[in-house]
Amino acid sequence: MARREEAKEFEERVVTINRVAKVVKGGRRFRFTALVVVGDKNGRVGFGTGKAQEVPEAIKKAVEAAKKDLVVVPRVEGTTPHTITGRFSSGSVFMKPAAPGTGVIAGGPVRAVLELAGITDILSKSLGSNTPINMVRATINGLKNLKNAEDVAKLRGKSVEELYN
């Protein structure tokens, strides 16, 4: 019973499934890799990769890996607290807060991460490498580096009101 409740805690989204081959003496051996993003649409999101000989098994492995590495995303009224650029390898993702009602303006893998993080209004642009894994990692990197006003005030030893004056 506990296993079913845990499954409902996070929503899963398969970003890519890729067939990879190992060349051996007798020919090629095929396997599948899966890139999956999981999130609760309430500020927690993670991604994982899995590899197996069958697609469902690869997805299952990826989901387990994603649940082990969750990131908490600070949100302000359904968007990010400030503009940020996430970078990974040669790919970068620029994310900018948007007014309520704008929606998620993002492409493919970036959209999956932002929606499952619970962000409802944001503008984003992916630059450089457009490999799905690089885009997902760059997005997660950017979300990890977000700071809300309370965190900044605490770091500076001031109150939130003092920051805005």
Swiss-Prot record:
Source organism, top-level taxon: Bacteria
Domain comment quoted from the record: The N-terminal domain interacts with the head of the 30S subunit; the C-terminal domain interacts with the body and contacts protein S4. The interaction surface between S4 and S5 is involved in control of translational fidelity.
Residues in S5 DRBM domain copies: 10-73
Family per record: Belongs to the universal ribosomal protein uS5 family.
Keyword flag Ribosomal protein: yes
Oligomeric and partner information: Part of the 30S ribosomal subunit. Contacts proteins S4 and S8.
Cross-referenced Pfam families: Ribosomal_S5, Ribosomal_S5_C
Keywords assigned: Ribonucleoprotein, Ribosomal protein, RNA-binding, rRNA-binding
Disulfide bonds: none
InterPro entries registered for this protein in UniProt: Ribosomal_Su5_D2-typ_SF, Ribosomal_uS5, Ribosomal_uS5_bac-type, Ribosomal_uS5_C, Ribosomal_uS5_N, Ribosomal_uS5_N_CS, Ribsml_uS5_D2-typ_fold_subgr
Cytoplasm recorded as keyword: no
NCBIfam families according to UniProt: rpsE_bact
Gene3D superfamilies reported in the protein's UniProt record: 3.30.160.20, 3.30.230.10
GO molecular function: rRNA binding; structural constituent of ribosome
Designated name of the protein: Small ribosomal subunit protein uS5
Gene symbol of the encoding locus: rpsE
GO term, biological process aspect, one: translation
Signal peptide: none
Functional description taken from the UniProt entry: With S4 and S12 plays an important role in translational accuracy. Located at the back of the 30S subunit body where it stabilizes the conformation of the head with respect to the body.
GO cellular component, one term: small ribosomal subunit
